């Protein structure tokens, strides 16, 4: 067996020297001192790299076990390899170089392995030296005092032992502390302005109302913060007529009506007007009386709800209409019933305005308007019923006397003699009515 002198490794940062010596097939590496920790016994390497004896051999370098990471180790028949730090990488290089059968790859006598950080400078090292960057694992060889990059130790083929059994699942760690609340996000950009809606009552706040159903003048002061007033009113209804035989017992017409007509107002503004009266019913031989108009004045605007008319000898009373300012539409007048068409005409619909229904001729019913019905007749030979207003049913005739009309409806007619004994006094027309609702915008 021929012997040769092996190189030694020099660590410039901790002044640790690893001496390498051997003969023929076996190489001994004697580690003298690594961070003041001594080596128990030599480490024996065989050149074929398949076996070595480990007899309590170890050395500590920066608290890592160096002896466990050298070449291909056989410990208790288990093959393993580990690379944990720069010192282990050095030994892998040594193992690879020493395991080569090609003598040209062996380290020259007195060459050394240097370990540092970064690429080596040509001013250090001699021909045949090896330099390892312990951070990147790059290694170089010195060729005639010029360092030549060779490769990276991490790329060398590694041999691992047979995988062991899968360990038990570890215990779930404790829940970490809750993180801090994130910062509030920026306010988003302002959206486009929506289309203007149509004005309705629901867009306004109700304040209060003024009402009067007694005939005569009235005054209403616009309350604080009010910006709009809704006007509702009706003229007085016409009284019915009474007669005997085959003439004179017809129903009266109803007054014209206005419902929730909107008007702009300001606080403390004064609204004045007059509530119309219902016409009185006639007696035998006399005709009933017409009602009177209801008038509402707001600044320069005047609204007139015309009264219902009393019957004539040949027809029931006509219904009243509504007159606004000049140029505004008024609903058509509803005519009273006649001999050829005994029932009164129904009221007509206008712009926030409604004409009163006509009164019935003898034996005919009064006309209808919206949800209200005309007064009822008791048959062909009985008196006619009064016309309905947009606020109340028309007056009727019964065996107990006339049903009193209200809120502008027409009075029922009366008859003195006939199949059924009826009172000779006809019904009165209903009085007029005013209501003003105030809202703020």
Curated annotation (Swiss-Prot):
Residue span(s) of domain Collagen-like: 164-199
Bias-annotated ranges (Basic and acidic residues): 187-198
Disordered, as annotated region: 171-198
Keywords: Collagen
Protein name per Swiss-Prot or TrEMBL: Putative collagenous domain-containing protein R238
